[in-house]
Curated annotation (Swiss-Prot):
Associates with 90S and pre-40S pre-ribosomal particles. Residues 1-169, 280-300 are annotated as: Disordered. Pfam families: RRP36. This is rRNA biogenesis protein rrp36. The gene is rrp36. Belongs to the RRP36 family. Its main location: nucleus.
Amino acid sequence: MLSTKRKALDTGLQRRVRARREASEEIEESSSDSAPSETGKNDAEGGSSSDEEVDDDDDEELSESEEEASNGAASISFGALAKAQATMSKPSKRDSKNLKKSNGDGWEDNEATERKAGKKDQRDFTRSSKNAPTEVSSKKAVSRRREVVPVKKREIRDPRFEPTNGPVDMQKIEKNYDFLVDYREDEMKKLKETIRKTKDEDEKEKLKRELLRMESRKKTDARKRKAREVLDKHRKEEKELVKEGKTPYYLKKAEQKKRVLLDTFGELKGRQLDRVIERRRKKVEGKEKKNMPRARRMVD
């Protein structure tokens, strides 16, 4: 069946086609050949009749082949046609996308897809020159999420130190958590023992830094405790004076530091006091040199 169809198409393609002669050429030939011979006329008539017969035969063969092909196509079942259509290669997604881009405007297609997906506009709006204004697309997707009432971010809080519970009493807190000081002391002792037994230098340096951090924290806590004690002592004295009818005197920050230093180093004598004063002098001098401009620092 398929062979008959292919044969019909081949015969149709191989059919001889005669070119038509224009009227001007016929007139010129007739004028040039004023007296043709009878034999020439007979030959021409015979040739034209033979050509017409060949054309008629070709037309009959083509019509017969077309009828055979239509009959063969009618006899094919729908299942076979469906299978043939399924086996045909379908265009891939990439080819269809490229076809869309080539047919339509890529700029508008990108905008539509980005607007549909709710994404940011990824196009590069470059300026023609540095003096030209920057071009920005106004076709951006609007978020469906709306904040009618702004909700504050939930912060991590400790209910023990909330203002609703009243002012924080540091003395009471220190008294309640006084057992932590003993824990820290035991931990420092164990850390010192571990440093002494450790052979690895890197691990030893790490443990030493941890011990130094704990010792500095201990000194800071002791200094703060001393400052609170000095301030509490001054407040008690002022309360007694207020009972006697005198006006209260509130210490400034600088005065508080001065009293803490006097109370801390007032008991020291001789070389201990000189050593502490020299250490504090170097500390203050280092801070001043650090804050000094580089040019003046080099001159000094």
